[in-house]
Amino acid sequence: MARKGAPKKRLLLPDPIYNKVSVHMLVNRILKNGKKSIAYRIVYSVFRKISETMNQNPVEVWEKALNNVKPRVEVKPRRRAGSIQQVPRVMPSAERARAIAIRWIVSACQKKAGKDMISKLFSEISEASNKNGAAFRKKEELHKMALSNLMNSRRPDKIVKAITEQSEINDDVY
């Protein structure tokens, strides 16, 4: 196999209206069959609905929801002594944590029954900003799994500190 090295990171441009990369990442995650205009329409309708009903800046609500859902640690399966163990580790980058959080929010919306995507995404973002909802529960579940598998990690003190620490992961990248 050829050894080409790690693939280059693609630079994402911010979205045209709110000028935020995280909003553009959400649009790309909602995208279906290459119809980006429909994805933009869904996201902007949700943001309009947030500003009307919650009387808050929709980008701030979105960032708050994203920070509440971002995992601090992840669990990787490793093969040790003939068995597969779940080994927790601190999240390697803020980019990865943000991408996982967006993926969880969108998948939680898609799993909800009935209604249109606008109302499902609105309810999930508002619940995540209030530390509720399916995506937030998924993060809590992952952290519990990491705590229960602490004995498999090399540095359990770092993992405990990352989970219990209330400060957010540094977003120096975006």
UniProtKB/Swiss-Prot annotation:
SUPFAM superfamilies referenced in this protein's UniProt entry, alphabetically: Ribosomal protein S7
Predominant location: plastid
Any one biological process term the GO annotation gives: translation
Highest taxon of source: Eukaryota
One Pfam entry name: Ribosomal_S7
Keyword Calcium (UniProt): no
GO CC terms: chloroplast; small ribosomal subunit
Record GO terms (molecular function): rRNA binding; structural constituent of ribosome
UniProt KW keywords: Chloroplast, Plastid, Ribonucleoprotein, Ribosomal protein, RNA-binding, rRNA-binding
Subcellular location field: Plastid, Chloroplast
InterPro entries per the UniProt record, alphabetical: Ribosomal_uS7, Ribosomal_uS7_bac/org-type, Ribosomal_uS7_dom, Ribosomal_uS7_dom_sf
Subunit: Part of the 30S ribosomal subunit.
Functional note: One of the primary rRNA binding proteins, it binds directly to 16S rRNA where it nucleates assembly of the head domain of the 30S subunit.
Family, per entry: Belongs to the universal ribosomal protein uS7 family.
UniProt protein name: Small ribosomal subunit protein uS7c
Organism (species): Stigeoclonium helveticum (Green alga)
Gene it is expressed from: rps7
